[in-house]
Every structure is written in structure tokens, then in C-alpha cells.
Amino acid sequence: MSQASVEIVKEFFAANRFFVLGDEDILFIRNSLARESAGSPGFVIPSDEITLIKNGVVKVISWHTMKFTPAVLNKNPEIFDFVAGSYRHIVKKTFMEENFSRILVIPALPSSENLRIDSIKIMKEKGIDGVITFPSLIAGLIDKIEARQVYLSSVNEVLRILKFYRFFVEKEQILPF
């Protein structure tokens, strides 16, 4: 587990107005502003759809050099420990019988369409409701950071400084003509 990766994920959810509780690499998230009628995100959740989630248990997997192929998922069953096991009791207490999503934050899915489909199938079979990739999550956090605002969080402050000095490429404007 990388504490830096967990902190980035915490800040992403906090920037999107979630309440966040942490227990090592497991986060419990609650979005009191979520509307039931807004729908739900797909399995691969883009950062701009994260606010559709009301409650969630999030496991941060910071194996940044790996893509989550079927082989990786099958060789590492501990990835799915948070779905069952000792966390069940904590989840029931935290969400008081309300529905919640089981979400993995992972570096990447396979590039190959067949491997991607197989990986998603395995994760669904193991009880995962959605995944967020680190590139999407980090881009979403950077979008929320204001270059001229000071942040108490060291993660956000580092991102703010990098954004201020234009280390991140601005999105290209698309003109209507």
C-alpha cells in the first residue's frame, strides 16, 4: 500500500464533496448531495460521474506499474478481501443498512478489448460494483484545484503549485465553428 496514493484518492473524494473515513487502504465514502434520481455510473467510472455515487467502500490499489489483466486479478485474490471478510461488520455500521458501492481504484485496465472485458467480468463476479483508474482520478482532482487558492492538504498544495507554474497542459478549447 502506498500512503501517497491513498492520500490522493482521499483528496479526490473530498474535493467532490464526499465525507471520507479511512482505514489503511480502505476508504468509506458518503455523498450527502447525491440524488437517487440522478442515475448511477457505469462500471468504469469517469471522474466527472463520481458524484452519482451515494455511499461506497473504496479499496486503493497502488500497483502503478501493472494493468489489471485477468491474470493479475486471479493471482491476487487479496484484492477482493474488502468485499467480504472483516469489513462487512464495519460497512454495516458505517452505512446503517443503506446501499453502497464496492469500488476499486486501480492504475489501469488492459488495452486489449478482450482482456478488458474479461477483467471487468472477473471483478463483477467477485462483487465489485465499479472501478476508477488513477489517471482519471488524478485528472479529476487537478481540475478541481484552483491555482490561486491555498490548500491545507499537502497533496492539494503540491498540485496547486504545479498547476500555477503550468506543469499541467490546459485542455484545448473546442470552438463551435
Question: What positions do the PLM features span?
Answer:
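Surface-exposed beta-strand edges and their flanking turn/coil or helix-capping segments
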Residues: 35, 70-73, 145-147
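Short acidic loop-to-beta-strand element that houses the catalytic metal-binding Asp/Glu
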Residues: 38-48
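Charged phosphate-binding loop/patch that engages nucleotide di/tri-phosphates or the phosphate backbone
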Residues: 147-177
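Catalytic cores of nucleic-acid endonucleases
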Residues: 15, 49-140
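Short secondary-structure transition/capping segments
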Residues: 55-57, 63-64, 144-157
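Acidic-basic catalytic patches of nuclease active cores, encompassing PD-(D/E)XK
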Residues: 1-37, 50
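Ordered hydrophobic segments in well-structured contexts
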Residues: 19, 44, 55-57
